[in-house]
């Protein structure tokens, strides 16, 4: 029975992962008016962009699309960068995370599709399509690392993030370090191509088997700060989070303590209560803020290891945006 239950759980996690990889965002990308021969009259570029992908992957086609309108005809695709309402967007963060951080509407609840391109609800109408601006000059060096023509800067940033996640899961980065050059390149290519089967073939080498728990769970929490805080607009909270924690004992129960479990599953609620107790005074119910992942509000009861196995981005991390309530 236990084996059957584990298999059913794996099927469920696999279906969630497929839904995550199928998720897309409609983007409306406009050339910066200062770089356009027609100022603000250039037609925008429209695309349904995979949530797990990265904005720089769009630069070659955007450079070709806007080529007739560019004042500077010699600009190169890798010189492109994106902004939203004047804010340069970090190119090393996935598209879905960037949207949830800067423009996300009220998160979808249980039962809502991950794909925002399908019949968006009224709560999404004001934010979709997500309107971005692409620039091919005036690179913001103080905020963004420059890209290169061969794409190695982007590749290396991705692989470094994979290494961090691998180290947290296993207590060592031996897995990613011993990947062949072909598999290392293939992992990044699978994310670019949104090829889940090719991705799973390689990423499963790095994951502990389902019956072996992670050492720690690679999760980062993003907290928005008020504009007048004098700090960057985002704060990232990260701490080693084991998938299991010491079990809490209910003294009112008359159970034999010798038969009580030594540990219990770490849920998202227990992790948030531990890291951010002022925002999450309850382990079970969102009171002041709610966690958002892939555009959806995440149940506080979700085991954090299962979140990573089913909902991680391509680099192995779960990126959760904390959205204030009310």
UniProtKB/Swiss-Prot annotation:
Post-translational modification: Conjugated to atg12; which is essential for autophagy.
Gene Ontology cellular-component terms listed: Atg12-Atg5-Atg16 complex; autophagosome; phagophore; phagophore assembly site membrane
GO BP annotation list: aggrephagy; autophagosome assembly; cellular response to nitrogen starvation; mitophagy; piecemeal microautophagy of the nucleus; protein transport
Protein localization: Preautophagosomal structure membrane
InterPro entries to which the protein is assigned, alphabetical: Atg5, ATG5_HBR, Atg5_HR, ATG5_UblA, Atg5_UblA_dom_sf, ATG5_UblB
A Pfam family matched in the record: ATG5_HBR
Keyword tags: Autophagy, Isopeptide bond, Membrane, Protein transport, Transport, Ubl conjugation
Keyword Transcription part of the UniProt annotation: no
Recorded topology in the membrane: Peripheral membrane protein
Glycyl lysine isopeptide (Lys-Gly) (interchain with G-Cter in atg12) cross-link, chain position(s): 163
Source taxon at top rank: Eukaryota
Gene3D superfamilies: 3.10.20.620, Autophagy protein Apg5, helix rich domain (1.10.246.190), Phosphatidylinositol 3-kinase Catalytic Subunit, Chain A, domain 1 (3.10.20.90)
Record has Protein transport as a keyword: yes
Membrane-spanning intervals of the chain: none
Family: Belongs to the ATG5 family.
Role of this protein: Involved in cytoplasm to vacuole transport (Cvt) and autophagic vesicle formation. Autophagy is essential for maintenance of amino acid levels and protein synthesis under nitrogen starvation. Required for selective autophagic degradation of the nucleus (nucleophagy). Also required for mitophagy, which eliminates defective or superfluous mitochondria in order to fulfill cellular energy requirements and prevent excess ROS production.
PANTHER family in the record: AUTOPHAGY PROTEIN 5
Oligomeric and partner information: Conjugated with atg12.
Name of this protein: Autophagy protein 5
Organism: Aspergillus fumigatus (strain ATCC MYA-4609 / CBS 101355 / FGSC A1100 / Af293)
């Amino acid at each position: 029975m236990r084996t059957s239950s584990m298999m059913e759980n794996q099927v469920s996690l696999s279906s969630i992962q497929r839904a995550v990889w199928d998720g897309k965002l409609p983007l409306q990308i406009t050339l910066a008016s200062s770089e356009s021969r027609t100022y603000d009259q250039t037609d925008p570029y429209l695309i349904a962009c995979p949530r797990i992908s990265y904005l720089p992957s769009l630069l070659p086609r955007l450079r070709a699309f806007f080529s007739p309108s560019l004042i500077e005809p010699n600009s190169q695709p890798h010189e492109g960068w994106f902004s939203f309402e004047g804010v340069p967007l970090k190119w090393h963060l996935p598209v879905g995370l960037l949207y949830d951080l800067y423009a996300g509407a009220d998160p979808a609840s249980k039962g809502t599709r991950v794909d925002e391109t399908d019949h968006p609800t009224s709560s999404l109408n004001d934010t979709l399509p997500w309107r971005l601006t692409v620039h091919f000059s005036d690179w913001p060096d103080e905020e963004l690392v420059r890209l290169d023509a061969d794409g190695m800067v982007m590749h290396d940033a991705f692989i470094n993030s994979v290494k961090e996640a691998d180290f947290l899961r296993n207590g060592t980065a031996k897995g990613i370090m011993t990947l062949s050059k072909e598999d290392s390149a293939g992992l990044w290519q699978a994310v670019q191509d949104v090829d889940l089967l090719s991705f799973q073939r390689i990423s499963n080498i790095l994951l502990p088997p389902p019956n072996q728990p992670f050492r720690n769970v690679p999760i980062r929490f993003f907290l928005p700060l008020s504009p007048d805080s004098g700090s960057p607009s985002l704060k990232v909270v990260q701490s080693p989070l084991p998938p299991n924690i010491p079990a809490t004992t209910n003294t009112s129960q008359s159970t034999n303590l010798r038969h009580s479990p030594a540990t219990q599953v770490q849920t998202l609620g227990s992790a948030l209560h531990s890291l951010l107790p002022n925002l999450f005074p309850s382990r079970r119910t969102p009171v002041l803020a709610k966690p958002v992942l892939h555009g959806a509000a995440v149940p506080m009861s979700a085991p954090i290891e299962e979140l990573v196995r089913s909902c991680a981005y391509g680099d192995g991390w779960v990126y959760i945006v904390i959205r204030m309530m009310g």
